[in-house]
């Protein structure tokens, strides 16, 4: 539904469009059979912003996020994580606490992941920002009915985010599609597009962001 709203809003003259580069990397390792730790870094680098008067390509560092999670696996299909994020961006660096539940569904040739997350962002001189998020992600092998080392896969996800700060609320939607390279159980690489729309509830400020995204995911 949110994607449909986005397609309608895209017709407005006041829409803002941003394009850029979005690299990310993560490192995961086990503390025990049930507990694990994940460290992640991701960074957004803007190359085009329709709000610029000259409408030319111009590089701008948007933000960099440093994240750490500790998770407990309750079964092969259910995991709970708590995490912390430090965001570096122009104006003010922020702190964020994160809580999430991940549920995995496996079938003969595909897998579907559900993630329910809430997070709280703390600012120096602004009220707390609270967000509730749900992400649905599917993954299918592109070479045969199972994913084996050295093969490729397709990953598609959509995430809906509700946020509220003081008395003001908003919605954001994130749709991503990527081509994955499964080297082995400990190494994966993905390249794709991440399309985000937000400011649904802000009059005349609807925003599109399209990121060219690459990611490397390492497990020890």
Model-predicted regions and their roles:
Residues 37-39, 78-82, 110-116, 132, ...:
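Transmembrane beta-strands of outer-membrane beta-barrel proteins
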Residues 41-47, 84-90, 105-109, 118-122, ...:
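Transmembrane beta-strands of outer-membrane beta-barrel pores
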Residues 17-21, 62-64, 93-97, 126-134, ...:
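Residues that define the transmembrane beta-barrel architecture of outer-membrane proteins
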Residues 29, 72, 103-105, 140-142, ...:
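Residue-level signature of outer-membrane beta-barrel architecture
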């Amino acid at each position: 539904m949110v994607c449909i709203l986005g397609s309608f809003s895209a017709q407005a003259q006041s829409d803002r469009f941003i394009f850029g580069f979005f690299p990310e990397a993560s490192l995961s390792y086990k503390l025990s059979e049930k507990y694990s730790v994940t460290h992640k870094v991701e960074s957004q680098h803007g190359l085009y912003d329709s709000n610029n008067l000259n409408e030319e390509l111009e590089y701008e560092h948007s933000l960099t996020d440093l994240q750490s999670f500790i998770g407990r696996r309750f079964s092969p299909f259910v995991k709970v994580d708590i995490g912390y994020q430090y965001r570096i961006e122009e104006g003010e660096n922020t702190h964020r606490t994160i809580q999430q539940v991940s549920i995995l569904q496996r079938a003969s040739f595909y897998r579907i992941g559900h993630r329910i997350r809430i997070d709280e962002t703390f600012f120096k001189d602004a009220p707390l920002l609270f967000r509730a998020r749900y992400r649905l992600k599917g993954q299918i092998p592109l070479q045969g009915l199972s994913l084996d080392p050295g093969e490729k896969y397709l990953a598609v996800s959509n995430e809906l985010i509700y946020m509220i700060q003081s008395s003001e609320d908003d919605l954001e939607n994130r749709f991503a599609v990527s081509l994955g390279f499964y080297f082995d159980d400990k190494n994966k690489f993905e390249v794709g597009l991440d399309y985000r729309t937000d400011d649904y509830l802000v009059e005349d400020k609807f925003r599109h962001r399209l990121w060219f995204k690459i990611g490397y995911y390492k497990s020890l």
